Amino acid sequence: MTDKTSLSYKDAGVDIDAGNALVDRIKGVVKKTRRPEVMGGLGGFGALCALPQKYREPVLVSGTDGVGTKLRLAMDLKRHDAIGIDLVAMCVNDLVVQGAEPLFFLDYYATGKLDVDTAASVINGIAEGCLQSGCALVGGETAEMPGMYHGEDYDVAGFCVGVVEKSEIIDGSRVAEGDVLIALGSSGPHSNGYSLVRKIIDVSGCDPQTTLLEGKPLADHLLEPTRIYVKSVLELIENIDVHAIAHLTGGGFWENIPRVLPENTQAVINESSWQWPAIFTWLQTAGNVSRHEMYRTFNCGVGMVIALSAPEADKALALLNEKGENAWKIGIIKASDSEQRVVIE
């Protein structure tokens, strides 16, 4: 019998030691996100979390998301620090529009070859996003899968669970004619429309690292992390009777605002109430993108739209601006049986 080489998992492309080194690197930042309801620490087969005692009839709200092809841009530019914030933002912002307080977050990080520095940078960003939104990072999965991803390319997904009092769920059912719509300003394209962004960069031939826009590289505008609205919106809900909140993600104005409108209502958006941030003007010009397509693909400077009764509008604006948001009246709700649920004029 001939001697055979003894193979290991590492020979197959999976470095368990690198995975353990990553866990050691992130323990500290993960611990900072801990909430009092969390039971146990990292390393268990599952994460345990009790419900906060203040809820009388708690309803759990869950969500999952990724960051789309913004990830490709981040990998190409070797800038991974904000992607984790994006990941958390896309999940927790979807929860808070229903009135839910985010409780805990889990992440999935998959790669062809684990680079500990890159992965730690991403997870540090996830922890920062959890701190910004007040939820605990209770666990995750790091999968090194040679042959599934090219080189050190990676993908991330996030999962979040929150809680809301049953009687305080925000579902849009109370939106009515005469309601005022308030906008919350975005930090940029957030995490949507990046396949079109990358196509525009390709067609225009620009270098995002050397092309300047308002005095800073285009890359800085494009990789600005998604704004997390959780704490501001929860404060608003505590003090104002909010009828609906729309998170402007994929589908932009045309598809997201109708998701919270009852039948026979229409959102009328006043386009003159705000000026697009420079990055959106650049994208439209460089890509010769139509106005309709811009509002369908991008948030165009508006991260959320909130519906509430007209007498509450000024108080809501004062509260939101005091919390550091850029908030303004962007439109109204009208009665309409038109199939066009959103009008921008």
From Swiss-Prot:
Protein keywords: ATP-binding, Cytoplasm, Ligase, Nucleotide-binding, Purine biosynthesis
Pathway the protein acts in: Purine metabolism; IMP biosynthesis via de novo pathway; 5-amino-1-(5-phospho-D-ribosyl)imidazole from N(2)-formyl-N(1)-(5-phospho-D-ribosyl)glycinamide: step 2/2
Superkingdom of origin organism: Bacteria
Signal peptide residues on this chain, from the entry's feature table: none
Gene Ontology biological-process entries: 'de novo' IMP biosynthetic process; adenine biosynthetic process
Localization: Cytoplasm
Principal place of residence: cytoplasm
Reaction catalysis annotation: 2-formamido-N(1)-(5-O-phospho-beta-D-ribosyl)acetamidine + ATP = 5-amino-1-(5-phospho-beta-D-ribosyl)imidazole + ADP + phosphate + H(+)
Keyword field contains Oxidoreductase: no
A GO CC annotation given for this chain: cytosol
Single GO molecular function: phosphoribosylformylglycinamidine cyclo-ligase activity
Record EC number: 6.3.3.1
InterPro entries in the record: PurM-like_C_dom (IPR010918), PurM-like_C_sf (IPR036676), PurM-like_N (IPR016188), PurM-like_N_sf (IPR036921), PurM_cligase (IPR004733)
SUPFAM superfamilies: PurM C-terminal domain-like, PurM N-terminal domain-like
Family the entry assigns: Belongs to the AIR synthase family.
Name of this chain's protein: Phosphoribosylformylglycinamidine cyclo-ligase
Gene behind the chain: purM
